[in-house]
């Protein structure tokens, strides 16, 4: 399964619709034990839609839960970071099994 953010569209931020697609792709990957490749160039959640992006298991926090659940189940997750990786977007590579970052083009808030 490939899940991607596009920084040329609203900075790659997660909106209500974006996170629903992200979570649905994770559910399909989990149900079918498919490896996941995240293509990350993300500005995190769109804070102006916080009440629609964060609230429950099918929203932003649920994506992180699903990453942890897949990791515990042995489903490989690889993050390829192509640019910014700020706020909640930094958790995607941090929770992945392997991370590939483009030299001099990638930054993550991960310590």
Region spans (language model):
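A structural preference for short, pocket-lining loop segments at secondary-structure junctions
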Residues: 1-6, 21-49
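Amphipathic alpha-helical transducer elements in NTP-driven molecular machines
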Residues: 16-23, 60, 92
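Conserved catalytic cores of soluble enzyme domains
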Residues: 36, 40-111
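Glycine/charged-rich beta-loop-alpha catalytic/anionic-binding loops adjacent to active sites
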Residues: 4-11, 72-76
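Flexible beta-alpha connector loops of hexameric P-loop NTPases
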Residues: 8-17, 50-57
């Amino acid at each position: 399964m490939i899940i991607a953010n596009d920084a040329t569209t609203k900075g790659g931020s997660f909106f209500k619709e974006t996170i629903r697609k992200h979570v649905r792709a994770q559910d399909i990957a989990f149900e079918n034990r498919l490896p996941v490749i995240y293509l990350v160039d993300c500005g995190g959640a769109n804070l102006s839609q916080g009440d629609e992006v964060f609230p429950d298991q099918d929203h932003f926090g649920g994506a992180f839960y699903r990453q942890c659940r897949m990791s515990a189940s042995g489903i490989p997750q690889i993050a390829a970071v192509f640019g910014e990786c700020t706020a909640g977007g930094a958790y995607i590579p941090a929770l992945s099994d392997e991370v590939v970052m483009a030299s001099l083009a990638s930054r993550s808030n991960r310590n």
